[in-house]
Every structure is written in C-alpha cells, then in structure tokens.
C-alpha cells in the first residue's frame, strides 16, 4: 500500500510502498477514506513541539506514517472484535492508551503513560490502510461522510474538551484565539452549541476573521488591524472575558491575551507553538484566574463531539481536499499560514 511517512526530521515526508498490516485480537484494519491535516503534523515534520523533541524526548521511532484524523471503512477485524463488521464506516479516536496505567483506569486514556497515538508514535492515516489498536476507539457513522468526520477526531475532540474546561454558560463571554483555523472554527461552533455563551473570535488575517464570523462568532477582531485588548474592553464593557481558549500559545498570544481575562477567568491552553508563559504570580492570586492545560480529549469527549456533529449542530469547515501525494503541500500550507479551515487528504 502507499503511505506517506516521516523518515528524517526536517525533511519532506516520503511516499513509500509498504505492506498492508494484518489485524489481530482487538485490532481493526481500516481502509482510509479521509485523513485530516493538523498543525501537529507540521510539528512532527519539524521534529519538535516547542523544546520537546519528538525522538529524544517523546520516544517517537522513525519512520512513522503521519495522519491522526481518521475516517474510513472497516476492511478486516481481529478475532476479539465485537460490534463491528467489514464495510462499516467509522471515525477513529487516535488518542489511545494501553489500558493499564492510572490514567487509563480513570478514563483519561489520552494521558496514558504508554500512549498509542496514531500518526504520532503508531502508524497513522496518511496511507491507504491503517491499523486501529483497539476497536473501542471507533465510532460508527450514521449521517456524516468520511471527509466530514475525519477532522472531528482531532480538531473536534480537542476543542470540545477545551470548551468543557472553559466552564461556560449563557452569562459568560469566551475569547477564541486563532478563531479562523480548523480548530478555531470548531471551537466557535461547539461553544455556541453547548453553552450559549457570547463568543469573540480573534485572528490576524482578514480571511480567517471572516471564517470565524461564518462559524458563528458574535464578535470578531482582526488583531493585525485593531488593538485586540481595547476591542475586548469595549465589547465586555471593561470587564474582560470569562475564558480564553488559546489555540496557538505563541509568544505573541501569551504576552497579550491573559490580559483580557476578567476576575476568576480561565485561560485554556491548547496550542503547541512552544512559547514560554510569563505571568506575574500575584496577579493570578489577586484576580483568582486560572491557567489550564487541555490536551486532545478522552473517550467521553470523542463520543460527545461525534454525537454533536451527527445531530447537525457543528460541522468542520473543510476548505480543501487533496490527494495523498500532496501531503507535503498541505503541511506547507499550514506551516506558512495559507490554510483556512481544514484540509483533508483522500488516499
């Protein structure tokens, strides 16, 4: 089968012919119909998430097939699989655990001490076929097609969890930083659907700002043309926002947007751009604000976002479908900030 693999750090991904794996036990072989392209794939190709090196610090073994946003049809099942059959159209939660560590036992498998992350340290979906280590991490699709479903397994599950952590309700105001990207447009939709909160979207390109507006943001700010803090003070009548979801965590965003928080506000940190956080500790105490990390999502988050999408309440903003051979071009688009919404590869 054809597979697009990371062979050498910092170099273009390599299109290779490799064998089709055979599922055994609880494993499932999926014929990939759609693979979303995520900014994490940029970091993987670069070989680091900030200062964390994927090989030396995170234990990734090369070569590895990238692609963690996965949807497709079941081709074959192992002898321990129940409830699924060949031909079923499924989406796959790629953030899987080995099942025995403390975090797996409390239902937070995405924090597993020995994770099985497809497209990171296990072969992913930039290929014609992919092995799912355990069938319990699949969702049988009923209304969505594969292209619509694939981005939900990362951009959807990640922002669903972040919105949950933001503790929103109709009295609250949320600021989404990076609101026009694949994650940002999902965060806006999810927050609107589940909380009724007022949503402010901020981005730095006019087309991204327009995407955030189309996703349902009540207010949008172009930070390259407006003073974002002044606009936030105007919108909130000087109170500030009750929560920020920062999908970048860059030096720029972390130097600006914590200042947008109201008292008792939450700063939910999602992005992996690699900046350091510098904030005067007494201000945290005096305003009772919180900085909260949010990493992808667990099985409950996966089920939540899939049901929300199948009910028609949220929909990934797919801006481009591309061939498997164009994986490097798709990642280049993300790295150079040329992508709005989500790109999806079709093997």
Curated annotation (Swiss-Prot):
Catalytic activity, as annotated: a primary alcohol + NAD(+) = an aldehyde + NADH + H(+); a secondary alcohol + NAD(+) = a ketone + NADH + H(+)
Residue positions where N6-methyllysine is found in the record: 11, 213
Binding site for Zn(2+) 2: 98, 101, 104, 112
EC number(s) on file: 1.1.1.1
The protein's required cofactors: Zn(2+)
Gene Ontology MF annotations: alcohol dehydrogenase (NAD+) activity; zinc ion binding
Xref: Pfam families: ADH_N, ADH_zinc_N
Entry note: cofactor: Binds 2 Zn(2+) ions per subunit.
SMART domains (UniProt xref): PKS_ER
Enzyme class: oxidoreductase
SUPFAM superfamilies: GroES-like (SSF50129), NAD(P)-binding Rossmann-fold domains (SSF51735)
Entry binding sites for Zn(2+) 1: 38, 68, 154
Signal peptide residue numbers: none
Keyword list, A-Z: Metal-binding, Methylation, NAD, Oxidoreductase, Zinc
Self-association and partners: Homodimer and homotetramer.
Record family assignment: Belongs to the zinc-containing alcohol dehydrogenase family.
PANTHER family assigned to the protein according to its UniProt record, in alphabetical order: ALCOHOL DEHYDROGENASE 1-RELATED, VACUOLAR PROTEIN SORTING-ASSOCIATED PROTEIN 11
Name of the protein this chain belongs to: NAD-dependent alcohol dehydrogenase
Source organism per UniProt: Saccharolobus solfataricus (strain ATCC 35092 / DSM 1617 / JCM 11322 / P2) (Sulfolobus solfataricus)
């Amino acid at each position: 089968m054809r597979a697009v693999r990371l062979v050498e750090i910092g170099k273009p991904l390599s299109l290779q012919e490799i064998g089709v794996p055979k599922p055994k036990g609880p494993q499932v072989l999926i014929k990939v119909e759609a693979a979303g392209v995520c900014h994490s794939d940029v970091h993987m190709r670069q070989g680091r998430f900030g200062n964390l090196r994927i090989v030396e610090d995170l234990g990734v073994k090369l070569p590895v097939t990238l692609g963690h946003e996965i949807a497709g049809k079941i081709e074959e099942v192992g002898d321990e699989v129940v409830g699924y059959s060949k031909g079923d159209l499924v989406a796959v939660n790629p953030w899987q655990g080995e099942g025995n560590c403390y975090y797996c036992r409390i239902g937070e498998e995405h924090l597993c001490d020995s994770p099985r992350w497809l497209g990171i340290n296990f072969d992913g979906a930039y290929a014609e076929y992919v092995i799912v280590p355990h069938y319990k991490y699949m969702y049988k699709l009923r209304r969505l097609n594969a292209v619509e479903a694939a981005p939900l397994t990362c951009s959807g599950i990640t922002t669903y969890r972040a919105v949950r952590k933001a503790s929103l309700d109709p009295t609250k105001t949320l600021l989404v930083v990076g609101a026009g990207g694949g994650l940002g447009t999902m965060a806006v939709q999810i927050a609107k659907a589940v909380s009724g909160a007022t949503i402010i979207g901020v981005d730095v390109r006019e087309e991204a700002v327009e995407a955030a507006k189309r996703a349902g943001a009540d207010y949008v700010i172009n930070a390259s043309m407006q003073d974002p803090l002044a606009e936030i003070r105007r919108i909130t009548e000087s109170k500030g926002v009750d929560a920020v979801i920062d999908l970048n965590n860059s030096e720029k965003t972390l130097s600006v947007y914590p200042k947008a928080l109201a008292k008792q506000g939450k700063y939910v940190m999602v992005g992996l751009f690699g900046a350091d956080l510098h904030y005067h500790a007494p201000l945290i105490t005096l305003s009772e604000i919180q900085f909260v990390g949010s990493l992808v999502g667990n099985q409950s988050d996966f089920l939540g976002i899939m049901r929300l999408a199948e009910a028609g309440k949220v929909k990934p903003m797919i801006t481009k479908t591309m061939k498997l051979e164009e994986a490097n071009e798709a990642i280049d688009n993300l790295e150079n900030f040329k992508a709005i919404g989500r790109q999806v590869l079709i093997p």
